[in-house]
From Swiss-Prot:
Component of the dark-operative protochlorophyllide reductase (DPOR) that uses Mg-ATP and reduced ferredoxin to reduce ring D of protochlorophyllide (Pchlide) to form chlorophyllide a (Chlide). This reaction is light-independent. The L component serves as a unique electron donor to the NB-component of the complex, and binds Mg-ATP. This is Light-independent protochlorophyllide reductase iron-sulfur ATP-binding protein. Homodimer. Protochlorophyllide reductase is composed of three subunits; ChlL, ChlN and ChlB. GO terms for molecular function: 4 iron, 4 sulfur cluster binding; ATP binding; metal ion binding; oxidoreductase activity, acting on iron-sulfur proteins as donors; oxidoreductase activity, acting on the CH-CH group of donors, iron-sulfur protein as acceptor. One of its GO terms (cellular component) is chloroplast. The gene is chlL. Keywords: 4Fe-4S, ATP-binding, Chlorophyll biosynthesis, Chloroplast, Iron, Iron-sulfur, Magnesium, Metal-binding, Nucleotide-binding, Oxidoreductase, Photosynthesis, Plastid. NCBIfam families: DPOR_bchL. Its cofactor is [4Fe-4S] cluster. Pathway: Porphyrin-containing compound metabolism; chlorophyll biosynthesis (light-independent). Gene3D superfamilies: P-loop containing nucleotide triphosphate hydrolases (3.40.50.300). It is an enzyme of class 1 (oxidoreductase).
Length: 296
């Protein structure tokens, strides 16, 4: 299974990706996480340091693939999760999609690409140009990380459009949304009404999620010394269980930009009209089962 994780810049994709990777490993799967961001910090909370990138390694070998060994580019992270950072071209030059392609090419050369039960691509920001949409070419599922805010959901809608476009020629489905660190989900629910898709999980506004990034640890590692965080890990285990069940997923039909702008801005400009939509805090919400949607 191959999963591509997208979302607005700064929304918590890497933190969420690392914890999902650990959750999948806890379920007995062999997991590889590939960071697809020039900052090469996707796997930081798994390894505790910034690992060398594929591009750096290839450059040091003068792009002689035969001189590269698995241990040159694949690093063991917490919980047995293997980690790779694709890296990227110099700022303002080159194409990130090319880098992702070179990464996959090298892993295939090393006979590593097909050795894993799950490969998770953690992709930068909400950039959905052809280059950084490249991981969707390899993915079975896409997950979109969001919060209950206007900007994150607007970005999610653009990513949904990319999934729909890629699904024309690839066996790709949107597994669903993950709400990250949000005390409410009214805007998320309003968006999902307009663009039907599953909501895999909504994580409450937990400060330790943010702190974990600063500490360079996953929530699972922090929970070893702070058992009070075990309940946070359950959110990620729930996401992992849903993914391992091989959901049908959806081919989303994005909301037109102007329509979405009106839909979401109405919640801010006319709060009284939406009083009935205001929900309980997410830590008191029990997610109900959803029938999968398939929209063509």
């Amino acid at each position: 299974m191959k999963i591509a994780v997208y979302g607005k810049g700064g929304i918590g994709k890497s933190t969420t990706s690392c914890n999902i990777s650990i959750a999948l490993a806890r379920r007995g799967k062999k997991v590889l996480q590939i960071g697809c961001d020039p900052k090469h910090d996707s796997t930081f909370t798994l390894t505790g340091f910034l690992i060398p990138t594929i591009i750096d390694t290839l450059q040091s070998k003068d792009y002689h693939y035969e001189d590269v060994w698995p241990e040159d580019v694949i690093y063991k992270g917490y919980g047995g999760v293997d980690c790779v950072e694709a890296g990227g071209p110099p700022a303002g030059a080159g194409c990130g999609g090319y880098v992702v392609g070179e990464t996959v090419k090298l892993l295939k050369e090393l006979n590593a690409f097909y050795e894993y039960d799950v490969i998770l691509f953690d992709v930068l920001g909400d950039v959905v140009c052809g280059g950084f949409a490249a991981p969707l070419n390899y993915a079975d599922y896409c997950i979109i990380i969001t919060d209950n805010g206007f900007d994150a959901l607007f970005a999610a809608n653009r990513i949904a459009a990319s999934v729909r476009e890629k699904a024309r020629t690839h066996p790709l489905r949107l597994a669903g949304l993950v709400g990250n660190r949000t005390s409410k989900r009214d805007l998320i629910d309003k968006y999902v009404e307009a663009c039907p898709m599953p909501v895999l999980e909504v994580l409450p506004l937990i400060e330790d999620i943010r702190i974990s990034r600063v500490k360079g640890k996953t929530l699972f590692e922090m929970a070893e010394s702070e058992p009070s965080l075990d309940y946070v890990c359950e959110f990620y285990l729930n996401i992992a269980d849903q993914l391992l069940a091989r959901p049908e997923g959806v081919v989303p039909k994005e909301v037109p930009d102007r329509e979405l702008f009106s839909l979401l801005s109405d919640f801010y400009l006319n709060p009284a009209n939406n009083a009935s939509s205001i929900e309980q805090p997410t830590d008191s919400i029990v997610q109900s089962e959803q029938e999968p949607f398939l929209i063509i």
